[in-house]
Amino acid sequence: TGLKTHCKICLVVRKDKDGIRRYLHMGTGNYNDSTARFYTDIGMFTCREEYGVDASSLFNVLTGYSTPPEYNKFIVAPHGMRPFFEAMIIQETENAKLGLPAKITAKVNSLVDPEIISLLYDASNAGVKIDLIVRGICCLVPGVHEFSENIRVISIVGQLLEHSRI
């Protein structure tokens, strides 16, 4: 399929007295029993139908069994992620223009996409407070008067992979 996959999902499908039930765990880190003694990654365990259906659909796409569907809850690259992020940035920009609270906090591996960067600059100029945590390369220039003054970037460039952990 030519896709780069970086997802932490475990899906158990079980037939019980009420029919098919899907149990799903999604997390930020690897399923590694030796490191589990030292820290806990952030995860979600659910049997809510809409998440289970999305997980089943995702596995079907990754194995080549089907084409990407319209997901109920999942935001999946490469098709769903860009429109989702664009819509969220535009929504916060509109909130700021209406005098409503407007803030963006995002943690990303890198920020090099010109269109997303342009939307973030527009949001900053509208008054949106933006905090970005960028692990790798960042092409956005923060803190420039009357251009990106509402944007703050924290860089966590380094040789160690970093996850949210408790």
Language model feature labels by segment:
Residues 14-15, 29-31, 60-67:
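Non-catalytic alpha-helical coupling and interface elements of nucleotide-dependent molecular machines
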Residues 65-74, 99-101:
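Gly-rich Lys/Arg/Thr-decorated short loops/hinges at beta-loop-alpha junctions or inter-strand turns
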Residues 25-58:
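Segments surrounding the PLD/"HKD" phosphodiesterase catalytic module and close analogs
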Residues 38-45, 69-77:
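Charged, low-complexity surface segments at secondary-structure and domain boundaries
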Residues 44-46, 65, 144:
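Alpha-helix boundary/interfacial micro-motifs
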Residues 1-22, 27, 35, 50, ...:
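PLD/PLD-like phosphodiesterase catalytic module centered on the HKD motif
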Residues 48-69, 83-84:
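Short, compositionally biased "basic patch" segments
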